[in-house]
């Protein structure tokens, strides 16, 4: 209801729904067992019904739990699949960045896997032929 009012008021000022960003407020899963499912459903509705972009503090979901990174790394690709368009995360955690990239690949956001390949392809060793180097290593 609140997001719908925001979109309506934004339209009064000529702001298109796709230029509005809504934060559905991620709650800690340790306190509310269905917090993940609630935010996935809300993001789907915000995207399909209101056509707005979404963001969140993604690590809120794991607040108060041990080994938070495991939950966060699983949560982000699921958010992407639900339609989340941005998230506040720590870009210094390589596993988290990899999880985001994987989510983009698996949902077709990274069409042709070009960003994934660019980030993770094995570099050629000195003197290797670009057409044969990796193939030979795979056979070995």
Sequence positions of predicted segments:
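Catalytic alpha/beta core domains of metabolic enzymes, predominantly
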Residues: 1-128
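Terminal or standalone catalytic/regulatory effector modules within metabolic enzymes
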Residues: 124, 129-140
